[in-house]
Every structure is written in C-alpha cells, then in structure tokens.
Amino acid sequence: MEVTNNGSNNSSTIASTNPPTSPSTTSTSKSLPPLSFLNSQWENKQSNNNNNSNNNNINNNNNNNNNNNNNNNNNNNNNNNSVKMEKLIELPSSSNNSPEFLNGVNNNNNGNNNNNNNNNNNNNNNNNNNNNNNNNNNNNNNNNNNNSGSGGNNSNNNSNISSPPSSSSTSTSVLSSSQSAYMNDKMVAATLDSIGKMESIQRKYEMQIESLMDQIQGYIEKEQKLRSQCQAVEDINAKLENENLQLKKELFEMSRKFKEIDIINLNNTNNNINNNNNNNNNNNNNNNNNSINNNNNNGFSPPPLVKYPSNGSLQQDAKRFKIMEQQSQQQQQMQQQQQIQQQKQYQQQQQQTTSKRKNNISIDGDKEALVAEALGSFVDYAKPSLKRSNSEEVFNSSVYKNKNNINNINNNSNSNNNNGNNSLLNDIQNWQQQQQQQQQLLHQRKKRKDYDYDYNSTQNGKGIPSNSSNNNSSNNNSNNNNNNNSNNNNNIIGSISPPHSSQLQQVSSPQQQQQQQKPNGLKLSISSGSIKDLINSPNKEQSSKSQYPSSLSQSSSIPDMDTDVDSTDEFDFGSNSNNNNNNNNNNNNNNNSNNSNNKKRNNSNNNNLGGDDDDSPDSNDRNGSSSPIDMEPSYDGANLFKTVTPGTITTPQEELLNEIHSLQMQQRETIEKMYIAQKQFLSDRSNGFNNNNEEILRSLQSDQTKLGSTLESELQALNQLYSQTILEPNQLCKLDILLQDVSIQLKQLHLYQMELNYGYGSNEPFPATLVIIKQPFPMVISKFKQLQEDHLCVQLLTGANVEIVSYSPIRAELVFHSKNLTKGSSNLGTQNSLKKNIEKDTQVLDPIKGVAKFPIKFLTGTRKSCVKLHFVLQIKTSDGHIINVPSSTSQPFIVITNDCQWEGSEGTLLKKETFNEKFEISWPHFVNILQKHFLKATKQSPIQPTRPLSMYDFTYLSNTFFGGKPFVSHKDFDSFWSWFGKSIQTLRYKRHISTLWQNGFIFMFLKRDVVTQILKNQDVGTFVILFSEAFPGQLEISYVGTDQKDSLSKSSNDLQSPTTTTTTTTSTRVKHYLVQANDTSGSKRTLPDFLSECNQFTHILQLNIAMIPQTETIPVFKREPKNVVLEPYYSKRQNSQNILGSGYDPLF
C-alpha cells in the first residue's frame, strides 16, 4: 500500500510492507472498535503527520544536517500511518473503509496544508540556529507520536526518533503502534460490554413496566365492570323505589276511601237512628200532646184528660196510658244509652287515629315528608281527590257526627223527665268543653294559605253527604218543644259551627278530577276571544287574597298535616252555620229570639276563630309569596312591607313606594288568574280540544307581554329612586322588599311565557328555575359561624302545567371568579383537595311549600375575596328526562378567619356593591348603600333602627372626604374608607362602644371647631366622646378643663424689707384627650371604666336620639351626670376592703 503526503514543495513515497504478525495483533482482530472512533483517530494522525512533514521540509532548506533527521522522522510517521492503513484495510466490507472515506482523508490532508503554511512561516523565523531546529524537530516528533494514540512512553519514542535511521528502529515503532492499538481496542471492548449490560437492564425494566401497565389496565377494566354493575343496581333500586312509592300512594288512597266510606256509614247509621227516634217521638207526641206541651224543668206534670177510645172504665184507660208511658220512657232511655256509647266509641277511635298519626315516623323523621313519600311526588300531592289536611278530617268528622248526635239527643230529650234532661245536658256540656279545647289547639297552629271555592260546586257530587234527613227530623221534632228545651238545644248547637262543605272531597276518577279542578267562577270560555275580562274581573267564589297557584297548589285543596294547619284559615264558619238553628224553631216566638241571639254569637265566634280580617296582619297571608309555591308567613313580602314603620313625614318617595306596592298586589291576582287560564288552555290542548286555540293563545301572549312591560317599568322606577334620592332606612327596607318581589314576579311571568311559546321539548328550555327568596348577603361572615335556618331560603318556580315525577336535594356551590368551588377544590386556602368548604350545603326541598332552608356553615376562609352561592336542583319529568334546574347567584360575601380581617373585607364588599364595575356613582346611590351596610355593621334592625346615619352625618362625610361633589370616585372612596372603616371596626368590636353610640353617648362626626363651640359655655367637667379625625379608629374625649397660672408680685414697707408674693389664677378652656390603648386594655376595663376613674370628667353630653333632625344642623343634646347614665356599663368589680382601724395604713 502506498500513502502520499502532500508537503509544501516536496512529496515522498514510502513503500511499506505488512508488519510482522504477533499474538497480540491476531487477537485484537477478533473484536474491532467502532468505525467512527477509528476515523477520528485517523484524521488526527494525518493532520499531525502533515504538519511534521511540512516542518521538516522547511528545515531541510535551512540545514542539510537536519535533513537526515527529518527524513527519519518522516519515515517513522509514514510507517505508523501505513500500519494504521493496513488495519483499516483489514476491516470487514460493511465498515466505512470505502474510497469515499479515503477521499475524506485526503481532503483533510489538503485542509491541513493551509495550517502547515502558517507553521512554515513560524519555523522560518527560527532557522538561524541549527541546534534550535533540531530541537524543534524532536518536539514535533514527540507530538506526532502522542497524536497517534499509541499510549506508549514518550521517552522511548523520542529516543527512537533521535537515533539514526535503521531497520530496527522502524520495527520498534511499528510494534509500539500495534500495542497502542491493542490497548485502545481493549478499552473499546470493555465499553461495549458495559453498554450491553445497560441495554439488558433497560430491557428488563421495560418488561417490568409493561407488566405493570397490563395490571393497571386490568384494574381499570374491573373498575368499569364494577361501575356498570353499580349503575345497574342503582337503576334497579330506582325502579323499586318508584314501585314502592306507587304502592304507598295506592295504599294512601285506599285508606282515604275507607275513611270516606266509614264516615258515610256512620252518617247513615245516625240517620236511621234519627228516623226511629222521630217515629217514636211522633207517636208520643200524638198520644201525649198536652203533657209534652206542659213539660218544664221542675218535673213531669200529670197529663190532662184526653178523649181516648174507651173499651172500659176510666181506670183501665189510665192504666193503659201509664203502661204506654213507661214503655216509651224505657225505649228512649235505651236509645239514649246507645247513642252515648256510640259517641264515646267514636271519640276513642278518633283519639287512637290521631295518636297513631303522631307516632308514625317517616324515613326522614318528618310527617310532611311521609305524606310526600307516600304520594310519590309533590305534583301528585296536589291531586283534588285528597283532603286538605288530616286534622281537618278529624275535626270535620267529629263535628259533623257530633252535631247529628246532638240533634238526636235533643229530639230524645223532649220526652224525658227532669233527671233525664239534666244528665243529658251534663254530657253535652262536657262534650262542648272538649270541642272548645280542640278548637283552641287548632288556633295555636301555624296559618296556612288556601283557596276558597264555591260552596255549590263542592256540594254537588264532591262534598259531604247530605244532612237533609237529619235537619228535617230535627225540625219536625222541635216544633213541639217548650221554651226551656229549645233554649238549651239552640245554645249547644250555636256553639258548634258546621264545617265548610269544601273541606271533604269525594274520591273520583281522573276525568272527574280534571272537571273538579275547574271552579265555577273561573271557567274558561272557549268561545270568548280574550281572557282579559277573566283576568281583570273579580272572582266571588275565590278569595282575592289567595296565593299564586302552582304545581304544588292545584285548583283543589291541598292536603297537609295537622302540624301546619290553623282553623282560622281552614274553615269558613259563617257560610251555612245558622240555617239549622233558624229552621228548628219556626213555631215559637221565644225560640226565634233565641236563635237570633245564637246567630249573633256564631258570627262573633267566627270573627274570633278565623274569617278574613282585612285589617289584621294575618289577612294577607294568602298574598304571602311572590311565586306560585306556598310559603310561610315569614317569607311574605306584603306582610313584611306592612310591618315597616312609616316615615316621620309623608314624602313623595313614600307615596311612590306605597303605590307600587298596591300595584304589586293587583299583579299577584293577575298572575294567579293567568296561571289558571293557561293551565286550562294547555290541558285542553293536550287532550285534543282545538276550539279557538289560536285566539286564546294570542290573548294570553298579549296579556303576558303587557304585564311584563309593567313589571319592567316598576323595576326601572325603583332603581331610579334608589340612585337619585337619599332615602330613610324604613324606605330602603320597603324598596328592597319591592325589588325582591317584583323581580320574582317577573321570573314567574317569564316561565309562563316560556311554557306557552316553546312547550316541552328535549332541546327546548324547561320552565322551571330556583330563586333565592331570602338571603343575609352581602355581608362579612366569620369562619365556623352557622347561618340561622330562616336566613337563606331557596324556592322552586315552575310553569302552569309542569309535571315533575321526582327531584333531588338542592346543592349549594361556591362561585369564586366565575369558577365553582366544590368539595374537591382547594382554592380557598387549603391544599387538601378532599377538604369540604361548606357544611350542610345539601338540603331537601319541602314538598308542600316548595322551599329549602340552608343553615350552612363555612369551614374555610375566602382570603378576603368575594364569593357567591349558586344552587342546583335535578328534577325528573313525566317523560323520563332529567333536567338540571339552576339558580342565579347570590349577593357577594366574604368569609374571614379573624376579626381583624373585617375592616378590609367590609370595604371590599361595600366597594363592589356600590360601584359594580363603574368608574363613579352618584352621591345618593352611595349614601343609600352605605346606610344599609352601617346598620348591618352596628347590628341594628333595618326595619326600625335605633340610630341610623342622619343627614348631618352625610353632610360631614361629603364635605370631609368627597369635597361636596355629586359623584363618588374610586380614589375618594379609598381615602374615605381608610378612616371610616377603622372607626366602624372599633364601633363593632369594642365592648360597649356600639351601645354607647346607639344611646347617643358618642358623637361620631364632629369637627374640632364645632366641638369647641358646643363646650364653650359648659361647666367644668363637661365632656363629649367622638372619633378622632387625625387617628382613625381611636376615640377622643373633649372636655372643659382648667388651667392655673402663677404670677409673682413684690410689696415694700417702710418698717420691713420688701416681700415677694405668689398669686395663682385659674382659667377654663376646652381640652382634647386621645384615649390610649392602655386606658382600655384588659378584658374587664372598658371605656366607661376609664371615664369613671377620671375625676376630670363629671357630666357627659348625650344626644337626644328621638329628636335627631333630618337636617344639616347640629343635633340636640342634653347634659347628664356620668355616674348616673354610665353606671350600667361599669364593670362589676369586687370593692376594696376598708382597712382603716384594722392596724394597716393606707398607701398614699
């Protein structure tokens, strides 16, 4: 093989033979290093050899002696290169020893020539000395040997190079290069072995990872199977629950039917008994007419002589008369005993049934929930085939049956003697007392809203069984009664009023139920072109003060438990209570007068027991909700509006609020009638009645559009009044009530429009929503503090013809920066993803009232950030669709973990509510919101506050912090709150400070010059308490104090030397003292305690709260001794013992 090295001017061709093989070289051929490694070594050697050859050629031109050495060195280098080339030639054909590779080597050599030229220039500068040239050549040889990678000793190579050229030196260099190559190959082999081991370990780990992934996949498949099984079990459970509810519903209806049948049977039995008694009484009356007419309370007078058909002597006739009289008396006594026993048995049965109902426990432990579960849903709960309440059934059946028994007893008592009359009257009086006690218990129960329907509509086919036979028999028998007996009977009957005929309803078929749901006074005329007259016309049969109907309150009466029923709203005692009394005594003048008295008594009893009193607060309970679902009176906006005390002066704002309130009451009745008309229209359309549907639809839509525009105009007027006029606290309360009620009415109207326009489709909105009817927000609430049960309430609103099969509990969620913070969230200052944020956040909807109460408790703080509440309910329709019913978000609030966070959190809430993403707001709008927050911070009632902010206070704040401008900006608010917030913090959390403020002992907003003017003419020791203007949140005491000045005066006398005298002058001035933290430090040292210990303060100026004017003048005050008015606020400390005379000296 020939290798050509291109120098600067010379080129040498070296013919080398194959080196002698050795065991080491043969062994290394088995495992060769990678080709990339050899290529790099080859390139390095070639570049170094080229450099050395060029340097040697340059040195040859300068010194002939050095030519030999340079040639020898070049030969050695060429031999090494030839050995390396032979190694490369022996590589397998798969290696990169191709001509292209050799061409790359030559290219590297050509590239290195340029570097050699630079080296030649450097060497030319050093050619003056031959010895230096030799040394340079030797160094170059050493570098060449090192670059070849032989790994041998540099000293040996240098010795070989410096020796004269010979064959032995050439062979030695070849052997050293082969050894270095062997060492390199050995190192490469070791590296490859370690790489192979690492690859095997990697493959092992990959196999383990694959096995783990297979296990995870198996677990996932098992979990999916378990989930599918659980879902199947849940579906089966749901089906079983539905079947169970259906069976309970059927059982409930069957029990109702049996009870109705029992009542009918009892009434029929009473009728039969009455008929028998009437027959006996008629016979006795025909035989003993004169004796009965002369009967009185003192005894039985002997019967007068009557012409009998005699078959013998008068004695026989007298005996026969006595026998007949004894037989009749025995029969009457037996009948009386039977009736009394029946009455006692019936009362015992009723007591047992009531005790069973009281002892009956449902799944949730609530009686109303038991009824709802038995019915399956609150929609089926409102079916007209059910009675209104269980207590009503007990009361009606007992009153109705007992009235018949009383008639029977009265009829039988006509022919009794004196003893019989007295015993019967005693029993009746006892029964009367029991009934009065029962009525008193009913009076004490909560009132419940209901509809009053036409008596005739419920009487025909649906009401109580007719009592015509009883009334007729009692009327016939009472025609022959005397004055005393008639008076007793009428008094007893007069104290008991018959139940309203619409209380009990007969079980009917679903078709009959649909007909029964349409009251006579509210029948929709299909032929009529509009329902405007129906909506605007008054309904005589239906109460004008009733509440909106809904899916929970159908046209018929709603069943309810006795715990939620009050007889004042349940029964109409004035309808037909006196007909029987007026018909009982139509033959006696005295009886007629007694009946008139009884009628008056009945009317008075009716007024006391119930009736609709327009002036009483309870008269508007039927108007209690602004939505169609029944609510408790506590949610009644109309009643709450009336409880708010009117303003001191009747202002145009007060008149406007009262006018909108009256319009709202009319709109409630309009929406109520609209509900009934729309429900009838939708039911007729679903049943296939297509007469004038389009005309009725257009009429409903036009009426709803008009009502919607009216409601929106009312909201606009209220908001305008809120932002343009400074209102009094009571007016603010009324305005908030009206805003809440009108907005709920508007939501209800939108549901009706949605239902009418869209209907129920799978892709269409469902006419149902949740509304927050009561909330304490916006407010700052402490962590772990639970809200009261009635402070946060949510109500379900639905359309007119909505059928809901079941529903889930309502769930409350936190909304923070438009993100829901559920139980698994950690955005509220916790890193535990499973930690709950709210306690009692899931509540069940009341199936009767449609309201859910949330006494929630917050378990984490919100880091001074505003959050809101959002409620979600899932309902299942009759079509099987599951729909999520959301609510709008609540007002913002902040949960704090420490009281020191209250100031900043309250400022954030106040700023968010006032500006509401605006740059500036009007001054009246800011004042109205500030007034509400101030009353809440000082824990005053918004309906009738003790001491709200006055006009003088607002003027002070406007001039001090806002420059008297009509608008408030963000910058002005920040400067205002930096002082006002700390003052409110002190007012809220310092002991006795809030009470002192409300009682007028603290002047909060006073300038220094105004204080000086107030105290200018006061006696020494008079003081006032106010908040410091220079130190926010600290209290200042301004008082009238004294200053003493000493003056020196000299006096001379002829006999004595001149003397100097000191005179003291006292002057008064107004002083100001800043209360320090040490003055009121400790749990039992308050501001009143500090004032009691300071002798400089004797009399305090107290504001007259009742006379605070709503003007910009200084409030009126009065001067009071501090120990008299502040004594209740002093801490009760143990008095120090009197140590005088006990051997101890006091410490001065």
From Swiss-Prot:
Domain of life assignment: Eukaryota
Gene3D superfamilies: EF-hand, Rel homology domain (RHD), DNA-binding domain, SH2 domain, STAT, domain 1
Acidic residues bias: start-end ranges: 561-572
SUPFAM superfamilies tied to this protein: p53-like transcription factors (SSF49417), SH2 domain (SSF55550), STAT (SSF47655)
GO CC terms, sorted: cytoplasm; nucleus
Biased composition (Polar residues): 37-47, 525-541
Null allele phenotype: Cells develop normally and show no evident defects. Still, these cells seem to be at a selective growth disadvantage.
Keywords carried by this UniProt record: DNA-binding, Nucleus, SH2 domain, Transcription, Transcription regulation
Biological process (GO), any one: regulation of transcription by RNA polymerase II
A GO MF label: identical protein binding
Outcome when changing Y1144F: No effect on dimerization and on nuclear location
Transmembrane segments: none
Stretches assigned to the SH2 domain: 997-1122
Pfam families recorded: Dict-STAT-coil, EF-hand_12, STATa_Ig
The keyword Lipoprotein is annotated on this UniProt entry: no
Cellular localisation: Nucleus
PROSITE patterns the record matches: SH2
Biased composition (Low complexity): 1-36, 48-81, 106-178, 268-298, 466-517, 544-557, 574-610
Described function: Transcription factor that regulates gene expression during development. Required for optimal cell growth.
Similarity comment: Belongs to the transcription factor STAT family.
Self-association state and partner proteins as the record states: Homodimer. Does not form heterodimers with other family members.
Protein name stated in the entry: Signal transducer and activator of transcription B
Organism: Dictyostelium discoideum (Social amoeba)
Gene designation per UniProt: dstB
